[in-house]
């Protein structure tokens, strides 16, 4: 009888442990804080999730892998911490915050709930604005060398141009895209020797 009781108690104990871990995981999954599956180096987890969403809207998944699958946001975060000067990193982060704030003010939906198509439309609208008003890009180039506080328009222009350029560069140089989308065949024809 004691053996039967021990097995019963063991079953109840393991069920309780299993159920509590599932409940904890479910509650943790309900948190409102956006998450990424990599550890950010130069950004907060919230900024990393925002960057990942922006990168995915620039290179969305279609028949080819998207920016998220290629690890573009992770690469950009690491590049910011290693390759950029501190003030450029500051411009990038502050520009991203201005971009997200303007998105929240001017769009019907908040940035965190927006689809990649909605974010893509906003980024495209920025480039249409830059095409119509080249002075904005000229102000960006001339403002980079100047010291002092930068305007929100400067920061946002810096961020949008840098994130699009860096996303495409990181996407096309990633291992996943290099092997699956653009595989290199050194000899495209069949070679028959003498």
Regions found by a protein language model. Give the residues of each.
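Structural motif
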Residues: 44-48, 67, 154-159
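Functionally engaged cysteine thiol sites
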Residues: 30, 63, 192-194
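Post-signal-peptide N-terminal segment of Sec-exported extracytoplasmic proteins
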Residues: 47-78
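A short N-terminal beta->alpha junction/helix N-cap motif
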Residues: 38-42, 60-67, 83-87
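N-terminal secretory signal peptides and thylakoid transit peptides that target proteins
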Residues: 1-17
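Mature-region segments of soluble proteins
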Residues: 53, 71-194
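C-terminal segment of N-terminal export signals and the immediately downstream linker at the start
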Residues: 1-5, 21-57
């Amino acid at each position: 009888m004691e053996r039967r009781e021990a097995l019963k108690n063991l079953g109840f104990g393991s069920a309780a442990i299993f159920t509590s871990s599932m409940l904890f995981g479910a509650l943790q999954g309900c948190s409102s804080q956006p998450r990424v599956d990599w550890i950010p180096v130069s950004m907060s987890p919230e900024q990393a999730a925002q960057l990942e969403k922006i990168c995915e809207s620039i290179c969305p998944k279609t028949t080819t892998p998207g920016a998220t699958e290629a690890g573009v946001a992770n690469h950009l975060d690491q590049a910011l911490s290693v390759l950029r000067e501190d003030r450029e990193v500051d411009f990038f982060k502050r520009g991203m915050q201005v971009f997200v704030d303007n998105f929240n003010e001017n769009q019907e939906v908040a940035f965190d709930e927006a689809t990649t198509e909605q974010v893509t439309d906003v980024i495209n609208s920025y480039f249409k604005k830059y095409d119509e008003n080249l002075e904005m890009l000229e102000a960006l180039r001339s403002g980079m060398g100047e010291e002092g506080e930068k305007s929100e328009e400067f920061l946002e222009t810096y961020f949008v141009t840098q994130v699009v350029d860096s996303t495409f560069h990181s996407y096309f140089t990633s291992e996943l895209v290099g092997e699956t989308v653009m595989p290199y065949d050194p000899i495209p024809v069949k070679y028959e020797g003498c």
